[in-house]
Amino acid sequence: MNPVLAVQDLRYELSGDGRALVDGVSFTVGAGETLVLLGRSGSGKTTTLKLVNRLLVPTSGAVLIAGEPADAVAATQLRRRIGYVIQEVGLFPHFTVAANVGLLPRLEQWPEDRIARRVRELLVLVGLDPDTFAARFPHQLSGGQRQRVGVARALAVDPPLLLLDEPFGALDPITRVELQREFRGLQGRLGKAMVFVTHDVREGLLLGTQIGLLDSGRVIFLGSPDEFRASTLPAVRQFMEAA
């Protein structure tokens, strides 16, 4: 069986100077697995996610979704197979919570009653009472509530793959811990393949089934959380000492 996501020798160069922001990156992620990409700022984590989602086009290498080359699929269709959650959430400010969560199903021309059921189901899943929150606007929500809505929206059309880029990074420490705990529960219930970007090693070790450490655009470590903890690689030790 093909993994949900396979990244093969991915390279991305800046046009003009040939400098690689991502260089030779390879990994696979199966259903129910969460690959955490760790690394300092500028190490290539977010660029890698954008290459998977075709927000950027790789210079060379391949991205396969369920065995199908991503570049063989229309970009709009590809993004409907991939849920994307970012730190800034990106909710439409003049849409209600229900309209934000139901946006992709509506673009997919789902019947309105099916959209309404899906919105309620997802709000319950992420811990928001639909009767309380569905009619609210993003400015009426706390940071943690907005992030929950962002996760619900990413799940709306049931994509097999979720990409999460520092989703809890802008939250206060208490809310961040709450959402990390809730996210662990969602992992087991959803069975999605996930790629989770963070610079927080404690968060990565808590949430990941695999850890990938990037440095200057290259994966210098790929293994389980226990293997990461036991590694003698100097770059890994630096991260562990900062935990």
Model-predicted segments: where are they?
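Helix-to-loop junction immediately C-terminal to a conserved catalytic motif
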Residues: 53
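Conserved signature/switch motifs of ABC ATPase nucleotide-binding domains
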Residues: 139, 157
